[in-house]
Swiss-Prot record:
Signal sequence coordinates: 1-19
Domain of life: Eukaryota
The keyword Disulfide bond appears for this protein: yes
Domain ShKT stretches: 200-233
Residue ranges annotated for the SCP domain, each copy included: 38-164
Lineage start: Eukaryota, Metazoa, Chordata, Craniata, Vertebrata
Cited PANTHER family: CYSTEINE-RICH SECRETORY PROTEIN-RELATED
SMART domains from the UniProt entry: SCP
Record function comment: Blocks contraction of smooth muscle elicited by high potassium-induced depolarization, but does not block caffeine-stimulated contraction. May target voltage-gated calcium channels (Cav) on smooth muscle.
Name of the protein this chain belongs to: Cysteine-rich venom protein 2
Cystine crosslinks: C75-C153, C92-C165, C148-C162, C184-C191, C187-C196, C200-C233, C209-C227, C218-C231
Keywords, alphabetical: Calcium channel impairing toxin, Disulfide bond, Ion channel impairing toxin, Neurotoxin, Secreted, Signal, Toxin, Voltage-gated calcium channel impairing toxin
Subcellular location: Secreted
């Protein structure tokens, strides 16, 4: 039987005759498969070209996984409402994959990553208009909390969802999802196998917080509340 797979926002339907597995055996509730999903993401993040000087190591997050499960259980090939994709202070991004047969999680993640063929670092989508958002979310440097889940919607419809916190794919930075340079160049004292392990626990509300803090310092409650990462996360990846 030929399986079809679809990635959200991808207009074409892709066909594949191998890679299918028993759905129950691939449950993301199992610790082994959580480890497989995290390890697959980290291996891909570690292997980016050009190399990344600020790429954070991903870790499994149960709250993100619960949110992903609720999203998958809707059995709707559409992103879940943004307000339902939060973990603590972080807003979370989301990748969705649909297939007519069950797939191994490593194959799902690889399918998202394979959009790299239409991505050029520093330029973005090439040719222009190509879908690259699943790839860029996987390699977004500061997305370090990961949770995934799947749902069997029918005998011919399987939905896979991963959520990433904090969210990536900031439009103004989509061509540079990480800072190029020597691996762990921005975290020499907090590095494990080429990935940084010093994430900031805060998230700035504005992309120009560096400029705001330079101008006004972190002396007002407004600045501290709107730019907490810039104000408080020294020597961390923000």
């Amino acid at each position: 039987m030929i399986a079809f797979i679809v990635l959200l926002s991808l207009a074409a339907v892709l066909q594949q005759s191998s890679g299918t597995v028993d759905f129950a055996s691939e449950s993301s509730n199992k610790k082994d498969y959580q480890r497989e999903i995290v390890d697959k993401h980290n291996a891909l993040r570690r292997s980016v070209k050009p190399t990344a000087r600020n790429m954070l190591q991903m870790k499994w997050n149960s709250h993100a996984a619960q949110n992903a499960k609720r999203s998958a259980d809707r059995c709707t090939f559409a992103h879940s409402p943004e307000h339902t994709r939060t973990v603590g202070k972080f807003r979370c991004g989301e990748n969705i994959f649909m297939s007519s047969q069950p797939f191994a999680w490593s194959g799902v993640v690889q399918a998202w990553y394979d959009e790299i063929k239409n991505f050029v670092y520093g330029i973005g989508a090439k040719p222009p208009g190509s879908v690259i958002g699943h790839y860029t979310q996987i390699v977004w440097y500061k997305s370090h909390l990961l949770g995934c889940a799947s749902a069997k919607c029918s005998s011919t419809k399987y939905l896979y969802v991963c959520q990433y916190c904090p969210a990536g794919n900031i439009r103004s930075s989509i061509a540079t999802p990480y800072k190029s340079g020597p691996s762990c160049g921005d975290c020499p004292s907090a590095c494990v196998n080429g990935l940084c392990t010093n994430p900031c626990e805060y998230e700035d509300a504005y992309t120009n917080c560096n400029d705001l803090v330079k101008e006004r310092k972190c002396q007002t409650e407004w600045i501290k509340s709107q730019c907490p990462a810039t104000c408080f996360c020294h020597n961390k990846i923000i």
